[in-house]
């Protein structure tokens, strides 16, 4: 009888805790601990968050008022041997799940498989790069898209095309938006900037990169180019969560390179399902992202190139979006251009910019690059 009372009280306590959690987890709490997600509209996230609160409240009420008694009755009659068998079965199930998840090729849980087109291959320092010297016609967002890459893994206009490292160039580093996911070459942001400025654009961007990886890619490639005119990268609050992940190569305080750390796959899956971030973790990533972007700007300027950070915006800026932009870009006075886009300017059933979105971003980039940088160097007249 005593075991029943203790179990019943514990279950009622859990139910009350769920009710209190649902009450305390207001919108401000959600905004502080669950970051924007690129693939989802904010209104979808708000609905999901409110649904979770309602489910927690209903579950807590049901447990405290209805289910606590029958569950306590069952548990109080259970034998030690029976409970051990259940525990063993649970551990075996978790172990089997971990083995099954590890059978898949490892890649960050927030990134696509490296085998999806355009294919990527592992890289010990960057995490992954596009497979070099390759062309493919892929089906992306319901359309056929041609991708071609040179021997260095830069996206190029056509098979066999190469990048001339001696020419004046605008260098683009970033992720799939910069790389032109779902767009043929001529419609990508770099290609449109090239057409507007009459200057070679070089795409160093690789799908699913964080800001750390984008910087590392630039640092590795920049020494090859003799006349870098500008370096363009991307920052989006809805992609900021990637910068918190240690399961890809990343930069620690002081720009110290760290290899990827692969935790238990079940833990990764749990974090993917419930992407809760502590205030301390977010603050560390704000500081780290700011340090990385400052280093990128300094690196570009050390070669006489202009640096520009592009901030595309599909939806009205939320309080979290504004906080991240202010803390990461405004406070250190980094050079950036915010590009507000029509919410409909994205690929079908996909959040990447379509031709209209890419055109608007490219126009903003071209306007932001100082005209004097586009002039050919003057030669001294012969004496």
Which sequence ranges carry the predicted segments?
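Membrane/wall-proximal cationic-aromatic binding patches
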Residues: 103-196, 344-346, 383
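Cytosolic-side transmembrane helix boundary signature
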Residues: 53-87
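Histidine-centered active-site loop/cap adjacent to the catalytic His
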Residues: 1, 6, 349-383
């Amino acid at each position: 009888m005593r075991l029943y009372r203790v179990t019943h009280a514990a279950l009622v306590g859990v139910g009350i805790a769920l009710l209190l959690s649902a009450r305390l987890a207001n919108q401000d709490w959600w905004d502080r601990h669950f970051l924007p997600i690129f693939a989802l509209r904010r209104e979808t996230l708000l609905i999901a968050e409110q649904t979770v609160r309602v489910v927690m409240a209903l579950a807590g009420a049901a447990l405290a008022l209805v289910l606590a008694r029958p569950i306590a009755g069952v548990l109080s009659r259970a034998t030690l041997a029976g409970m051990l068998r259940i525990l063993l079965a649970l551990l075996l199930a978790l172990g089997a799940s971990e083995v099954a998840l590890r059978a898949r090729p490892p890649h960050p849980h927030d990134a696509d498989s490296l085998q999806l087109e355009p294919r990527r291959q592992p890289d010990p320092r960057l995490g992954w790069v596009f497979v070099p010297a390759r062309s493919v016609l892929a089906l992306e967002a319901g359309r056929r898209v041609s991708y071609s890459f040179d021997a260095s893994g830069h996206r190029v206009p056509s098979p066999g095309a190469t990048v001339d490292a001696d020419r004046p160039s605008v260098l683009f580093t970033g992720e799939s938006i910069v790389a032109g996911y779902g767009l043929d070459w001529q419609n990508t942001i770099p290609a449109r900037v090239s057409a507007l400025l009459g200057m070679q654009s070089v795409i160093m961007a690789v799908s699913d990169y964080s800001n750390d990886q984008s910087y590392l890619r630039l640092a590795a490639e920049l020494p090859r180019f003799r006349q870098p005119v500008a370096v363009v990268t991307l920052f989006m609050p809805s992609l900021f969560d990637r910068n918190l992940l240690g399961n890809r190569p990343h930069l620690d305080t002081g720009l110290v390179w760290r290899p990827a750390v692969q935790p238990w796959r079940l833990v990764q899956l749990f974090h993917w399902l419930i992407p809760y971030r502590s205030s301390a973790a977010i603050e560390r990533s704000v500081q780290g992202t700011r340090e990385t972007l400052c280093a990128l700007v300094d690196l570009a300027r050390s070669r006489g190139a202009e640096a520009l950070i592009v901030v595309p915006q599909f939806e009205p800026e939320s309080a979290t979006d504004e906080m991240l932009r202010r803390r990461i870009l405004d406070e250190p006075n980094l050079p950036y251009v915010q590009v507000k886009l029509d919410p409909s300017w994205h690929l079908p059933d996909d959040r990447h910019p379509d031709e209209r979105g890419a055109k608007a971003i490219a126009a903003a980039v071209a306007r932001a690059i100082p005209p004097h940088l586009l002039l050919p160097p003057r030669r001294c007249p012969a004496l």
